[in-house]
Amino acid sequence: MKLKVGKTTLTLSYPLACVTAAVLILDTSGKVLLCFCAALMHEGGHLFALRCCHTPPEEIKLSLFDAAIIDRKKQLHPFSHELAITLSGIAVNFLSASVGWVLYSIHPHPLLKVFIAAHLTLGIFNALPVDSLDGGQALLLILERFFPPDRAERLLLLLSVLILLPTAIIGFWLLLVTKYNFTLLLSALYLTSLLLLKPRKPHRKTSAKRPQIPVS
């Protein structure tokens, strides 16, 4: 499902559209909808930063488990702009959680707790220095300031493995103890699959191009 918004093409997967429709119909509590809103606000932070840098994205792809903002001109961005664009989604989540906390201190509504938890969880998750997450891509930008691109990618890959391996072990232990809590294990396996499936192009010594940076 594609929609043209100015110079940007918005692609929405059918599974995501079906799940969104089901949530709107079945979620009478509003909790799942708040989690969806947190994810949308995260992506909106990236779009706002791109807009501020006067570089609207060429395409936005939204699927059930991922979101990608395609910006083929990102190699022309200054380092500060690219870093701000990468971290803007996390910043929106933490800012929203802070606002929610202030509102909750004034009027302690149960849905505000869900709002705060959704934004904090999404912000902390994306801030992890793992490849394919915003934190990992921001770290890659910084590493490429000091190392060649191929070495920077290897360092990020090593750090990602060092984080995901114990996370998967802890997630498996939680599943055994609780019999139902599989969220952490599923997240670790999902990120590991992205890490394994990510295409890695060989770098030439004479020309060092940054890989495409997906924004989640």
Question: Where do the protein language model's features map onto the residues?
Answer:
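Hydrophobic transmembrane alpha-helices and their immediate loop junctions
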Residues: 1-216
